[in-house]
Amino acid sequence: MVCRNVSRQQFRAIMIITSLLDTDLYKFSMMQVVLHHFPAAQVEYRYKCRTPGINLRPYLDEIRAEVHELCQLRFTSEELDYLRGLRFIKSDFVDFLGLFHLPERCIFIGEGEQPGEISITVKGPWLHTILFEIPVLAIVNEVYFRNTRRNPDWEEGRKRLQSKMNLVLDDPALADFRVAEYGTRRRFSKVWHEEIVSTMKARMGVHFAGTSNVLLAMRHGVLPLGTMGHEYLQACQALGPRLRDSQVFALEVWAKEYRGDLGIALSDVYGMDAFLRDFDMYFCKLFDGARHDSGDPFVWGERLLEHYRTNRADPRAKTLVFSDSLTFPRAIELARQFAGRCKVSFGIGTNLTNDLGHEPLQIVMKMVRCNGQPVAKVSDAPEKTMCDDPAYLAYLRQVFQLPPA
């Protein structure tokens, strides 16, 4: 799989991913649940580029070579000690990670069906493949940009970052504003990503809540952030007792694993209506809050606060996390809307780690099957729905009382 025109010695010097911690925290929190509750689950992930007109085929060899080197990595003793120090990580999980590597036999990279497209499929045990998604997307991004943007305008990026931070730092009314960096998968490069985190830590003070990237959290002494992702609730469509109960099943298993820790529920795998039907008084009181990742965030927040009141949970004690394509101005609008009514937190990704004046890639890698059965995400944004089985998608919509596409 190594690119023919780059020697192994040269290639190791330019590896994009050099640590298995260079990923998002929620991958580890989900992986621990998989180890303890679903160790035999088999899954399939599929890559998709939503940005039209992107030709990645000239870089296939580079991507394959980077992924090959990714699959040689192991966790170091220092990294394992860091994970062991996180309050919600259990010792048997760290012991498992001490033996872990990403299995190269489970990832398939080739040409896609459309001109310029590439195909990336991951297929195998969920426990052993869950850590592919984030570094593979980061590899695709960085390979593309280092070939198409050979002379990045770093100063422009720094000016843009400073202007964003100033929106918060220059406004005394935003004393309680907290923002986290969530941009690993779509970053321009790992070097730029690290500069973003170090700059925000140095200049934003208490306004900088932390980062989703575990490696950068460890290096810079900031808080690693994250709970659950869409794939967890999707997989439970195949792992739970029946489809209609899959969302409740997922939340109950999560609560059983973490006993009140990591208590931010993801709301948009089936859309907000279905989420609120399942998020009853028990879950309202048990979970610390919920995360918005599609649809109108203002409407979502108002509906959730009303739902808490209806279920006799004090909204002021709950946290609303916003993470859908956020910018600083949008986050500030939301902070003002919900000030004093609940706790709010913001995760900003691409707008932080890939804003140097050119169009970022809109790429994803989503779970499409679990234990041989189709799974789907039907979010509050129709363009984010991803499923390779129209019949299953229609059935899921019927079961969860969702409108037709």
UniProtKB/Swiss-Prot annotation:
One GO cellular component term: cytosol
Name of a matching Pfam family: NAPRTase
Any one GO molecular function term: nicotinate phosphoribosyltransferase activity
Pathway: Cofactor biosynthesis; NAD(+) biosynthesis; nicotinate D-ribonucleotide from nicotinate: step 1/1
PANTHER family: NICOTINATE PHOSPHORIBOSYLTRANSFERASE
Official protein name in the record: Nicotinate phosphoribosyltransferase
InterPro entries: N/Namide_PRibTrfase (IPR041525), NAPRTase_N (IPR040727), Nic_PRibTrfase (IPR006406), Nic_PRibTrfase-Fam (IPR007229), Nicotinate_pribotase-like_C (IPR036068)
PTM entry text: Transiently phosphorylated on a His residue during the reaction cycle. Phosphorylation strongly increases the affinity for substrates and increases the rate of nicotinate D-ribonucleotide production. Dephosphorylation regenerates the low-affinity form of the enzyme, leading to product release.
NCBIfam families reported in the protein's UniProt record: NAPRTase (TIGR01514), PRK05321.1 (NF003704)
Functional description taken from the UniProt entry: Catalyzes the synthesis of beta-nicotinate D-ribonucleotide from nicotinate and 5-phospho-D-ribose 1-phosphate at the expense of ATP.
Positions bearing Phosphohistidine: 230
Catalytic reaction equation(s): nicotinate + 5-phospho-alpha-D-ribose 1-diphosphate + ATP + H2O = nicotinate beta-D-ribonucleotide + ADP + phosphate + diphosphate
UniProt entry keywords in alphabetical sequence: Ligase, Phosphoprotein, Pyridine nucleotide biosynthesis
